[in-house]
């Protein structure tokens, strides 16, 4: 028997309102991958929960394609692998499910190809493939990060921010919203004046988070001009969730990533009341308390006993 690679990969929420394509935070929902060598010629994919059944089980699987892409880049040949997957990250809901799969594929290629990539190099690869660091960076490192990917130099730089001392509430609609569809409603360009305003709001939000001034941070998050005004109509529950959250003194209610999940930052003393109120009023969605993941990917090698 051979050793097995176990990966526990967190979900992520991106943007936090005004941090479009640059700010992200890891969340305590996980993609679990159990990977081992097999004698068969083709990779085998097994899904351990029904929510994953729509995913391909052949060479069209995203994990397979990314792993082979990395192997080719470093001129290594991967063995045939059995990949068992279990996930409580809902697909196409704005919680970074594709970023988690991408990061998992990088770790698989790194281990079974014996490439010896550092976390920094894993981040560079992930961002080059994804195009922006807002999901992949917190998925790899955990916590709350801001980052920038330079497409000319293909370099990504990230900065860690103290994890906010707040409670997070996720309100997850029953329907999917593909990132591509959500991006198609965004304008191609902004005026210089509009860009300066949005940049100032984003800068102020970051400084407020650093100072643990969550009231000010939330005020800035709610003034996004990059994406939320154009996407809110795609999420019919957004206005109702935001109105209820305001009744319980929430700091901010924003779209998680491309949506449709709605993220609320709440004072800890009000979060329980708020999530129960949301469950009672917004019955079409699932609302729950979530925890910020601070450690990122957990990698374990398990040997047969």
Curated annotation (Swiss-Prot):
This is Homoserine kinase. Its main location: cytoplasm. ATP binds at residues 90-100. Keywords: Amino-acid biosynthesis, ATP-binding, Cytoplasm, Kinase, Nucleotide-binding, Threonine biosynthesis, Transferase. Its EC number is 2.7.1.39. Belongs to the GHMP kinase family. Homoserine kinase subfamily. GO terms for molecular function: ATP binding; homoserine kinase activity. It is found in: Cytoplasm. It comes from the Bacteria. It catalyses: L-homoserine + ATP = O-phospho-L-homoserine + ADP + H(+). Signal peptide: none annotated. Catalyzes the ATP-dependent phosphorylation of L-homoserine to L-homoserine phosphate. Pathway: Amino-acid biosynthesis; L-threonine biosynthesis; L-threonine from L-aspartate: step 4/5. The gene is thrB. GO terms for biological process: threonine biosynthetic process. InterPro entries: GHMP_kinase_C_dom (IPR013750), GHMP_kinase_C_sf (IPR036554), GHMP_kinase_N_dom (IPR006204), GHMP_knse_ATP-bd_CS (IPR006203), Homoserine_kinase (IPR000870), Ribosomal_Su5_D2-typ_SF (IPR020568), Ribsml_uS5_D2-typ_fold_subgr (IPR014721). GO terms for cellular component: cytoplasm.
């Amino acid at each position: 028997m051979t050793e097995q690679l176990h990966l526990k990969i967190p979900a992520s929420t991106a943007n936090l309102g005004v941090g479009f394509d640059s700010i992200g935070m890891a969340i305590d929902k996980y993609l679990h991958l159990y990977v081992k060598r097999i004698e068969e010629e083709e990779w085998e994919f097994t899904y351990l929960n029904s929510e994953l059944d729509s995913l391909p089980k052949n060479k069209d699987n995203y994990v397979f394609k990314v792993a082979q892409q990395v192997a080719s880049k470093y001129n290594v040949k991967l063995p045939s692998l059995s990949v068992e997957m279990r996930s409580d990250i809902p697909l196409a809901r704005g919680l970074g499910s594709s970023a988690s799969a991408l990061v998992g594929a990088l770790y698989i290629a790194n281990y079974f190809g014996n490439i010896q990539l550092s976390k920094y190099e894993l981040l560079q690869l992930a961002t080059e493939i994804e195009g922006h660091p807002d999901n992949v960076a917190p998925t790899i490192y955990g916590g709350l990060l801001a980052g920038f990917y330079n497409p000319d130099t293909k370099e990504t730089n990230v900065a860690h921010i103290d994890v906010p001392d707040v409670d997070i509430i996720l309100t997850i609609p029953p329907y999917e919203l593909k990132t591509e569809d959500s991006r198609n409603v965004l304008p191609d360009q902004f005026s210089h004046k509009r860009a300066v305003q949005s940049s100032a709001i984003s800068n102020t939000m970051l400084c407020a988070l650093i100072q643990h001034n969550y009231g000010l941070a939330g005020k800035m998050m709610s003034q996004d001009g990059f994406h939320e005004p154009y996407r809110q109509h795609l999420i019919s529950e957004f206005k109702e969730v935001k109105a209820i959250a305001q009744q319980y003194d929430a700091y901010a209610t924003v779209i998680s990533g491309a949506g449709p999940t709605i993220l609320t930052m709440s004072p800890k003393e009000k979060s329980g009341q708020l999530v129960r109120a949301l469950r009672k009023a917004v019955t079409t969605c699932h609302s729950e308390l979530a925890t910020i993941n601070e450690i990122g990917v957990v990698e374990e090698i398990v040997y047969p006993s």
